[in-house]
Amino acid sequence: MSTDGESPEEPRWKAVASPKASTMPEKRGSAQAASGSWLQGFGHPSVYHAAFVIFLEFFAWGLLTTPMLTVLHETFPQHTFLMNGLIQGVKGLLSFLSAPLIGALSDVWGRKPFLLGTVFFTCFPIPLMRINPWWYFGMISVSGVFSVTFSVIFAYVADFTQEHERSTAYGWVSATFAASLVSSPAIGTYLSANYGDSLVVLVATLVALLDICFILIAVPESLSEKIRPASWGAQISWKQADPFASLKKVGKDSTVLLICITVFLSYLPEAGQYSSFFLYLRQVIGFGSVKIVAFIAMVGILSIVAQTVFLSKLMRSLGNKNTVLLGLGFQMLQLAWYGFGSQAWMMWAAGTVAAMSSITFPAVSALISRNAESDQQGVAQGIVTGIRGLCNGLGPALYGFIFYMFHVELSELGPKLNSDDDPLQGAFIPGPPFLFGACIVLMSFLVALFIPEYRKTSGVQKHNNSTSGSLSTPPERGSDEDIEPLLQDSSIWELSFEEPGNQCTEL
């Protein structure tokens, strides 16, 4: 049926986030009013709200790409990447321990308070970079307790989208993350070169404050009062605070267990790659600051295309599971290419493959969301984010240790290409950690082969028969969702990119 209320000038994919394209309870407005005016925000919850929050947070950190390398090297001149791995390891461990609790609390108390808390504490260390580097790195480690913005954001999006819409919505959110990295490192590098690192830190701090103000003023609460299992005054069981108890629950569901193992084995090398790759490009391959910024921008732009244009098409044509497998295949290829590559053009070519591998995370997030009830989205995404947080700690330490074992310290900021004392000159494997990472992703690929393509019927029927199920799954489509992969309905692609004058939404 046609959506007469939507402006022709508005893009079609807004219907994914609009309550007109979802089965939103009519009493959402009154529920928000009952929760307090500060929860209301502007308009209805939408992908726009989630994407803007993610964009500002990672834009602020993207500005610090160049200053971060400088401060890290100056603070830890010896064994730089081993120390970086230790710092990130503490942060990742704390994220792993806290993510399930924050997800469970957001299922009870709503998403907005925890969006505000996660962004505030994640960005809190930024101004300390120029005040006291030791406090800065110490606070980065401690901030891992709240570094779970993605899990809250994905639970936020799941509250107002139908199952077959979520991977598209998740793709847009993930693409926004990539978009924030397209320009922010270049801007940060320019400001650092011309005005000094202090101005970069100041700008990043202001962007973080803008993000906090946006959440406080503009972001509406997405979780209806009717779906919350408890009230603000209810106590939370300590079992919900135990991440290992959450993992035990995961072990009871073979599908979720396989997904979590896939996430761990795929994100472990990815986290290590993110922590060391830019210095690797600079020191071993010989990239200067301008080339590194251009490389980040290229991969970011291609990632946006992959997560918006290609992800939707792949989900419709291949299904959820096969899209995950394809993303893992791209990840294996790009890591192997980085491992064997020794020329600059090889890095650029592998970067295009790396951009295509970015479809894995939104596809996996949609898969885990599909296997969770509507009142357990925060817990489900929290478990996945906790595993990713653990990888954020183990990955950098693993890569730093492998570089150390191969006598590559990467502790200097200047490029060492063609240097006589470079141990990698003439080496058969210039990047050992990346090749090792490709082997780990191969294991992830083999595990993902055993993930069932479709959701369990019993779980969906229970979901449809519950009162909370009406938030995300319309009763008239309940039986159809049991046998459809995400985004199998071709109308979702039409929602995203059909000409504005020919808008038609099929419900």
From Swiss-Prot:
Disulfide bonds: none annotated. Residues 73-84, 135-136, 192-198, 279-283, 345-347, 411-430 are cytoplasmic. InterPro entries: MFS, MFS_dom, MFS_trans_sf, Sugar_transporter_CS, Tet-R_TetA/multi-R_MdtG-like. The chain crosses the membrane at residues 52-72, 85-105, 114-134, 137-157, 171-191, 199-219, 258-278, 284-304, 324-344, 348-368, 390-410, 431-451. It is a multi-pass membrane protein. Residues 459-473 have a biased composition (Polar residues). Signal peptide: none annotated. It is found in: Membrane. Residues 1-51, 106-113, 158-170, 220-257, 305-323, 369-389, 452-507 are extracellular. Glycans are attached at N464, N465. Coiled coil: none annotated. Belongs to the major facilitator superfamily. This is Hippocampus abundant transcript-like protein 1. It comes from Mus musculus (Mouse).
